[in-house]
Amino acid sequence: MGGLASELMDYGCEKVYIAEDPQLSLYQGDFYTDLLSKLIDENKPETILWGATIIGTEFSARVAAKLKTGLTAHCIDLYIADIKGKPRLAQVVPGWGGNIALIIICNANPQMATVKPGLMAKPPQRKVEGEIIPIAAEVIKNIIVGETKQSRAETIEIVEEEPEEMPLEEAEIVVAGGWGLNSLGG
């Protein structure tokens, strides 16, 4: 975990919270949601950005629901807008089948948005001397052994498969054709 925390600081993160417990080694939505929601309640961040991955999409929706805040999914652009003299995260999403772009502003905090991995360029590194904050073992245990006593989901087996082809989102060049192409020759 320390390597990831260091990499986050290479990109400007000033505080990195680390929760380590054997029961957190695999994603378990209920434990992760309770733990992150507690951290958000205590630290009051203005904005939370998520990767629009399989886990990120599900995890972000759980946290947004628990915190009773908005979540804008699959943003194609983000920027800070001045709304009534207050900086807010402008979240741009495709609408109407991709023919228009909609700008969404969430008035509640935390503002939350998901972005597809690789959609935006990595920012230049700006290494900071950040702080790694371990989450106390008793805090983790209280969440894991709270009301439910166990996760409602259980991992039975992990099967890792090598992809046969490169995932589309990782390709540098994508060529696509519509119904107008009758053959390879056009």
Describe the predicted segments one by one.
Residues M1-G186:
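N-terminal glycine-rich FAD/FM-binding segment characteristic of electron-transfer flavoproteins
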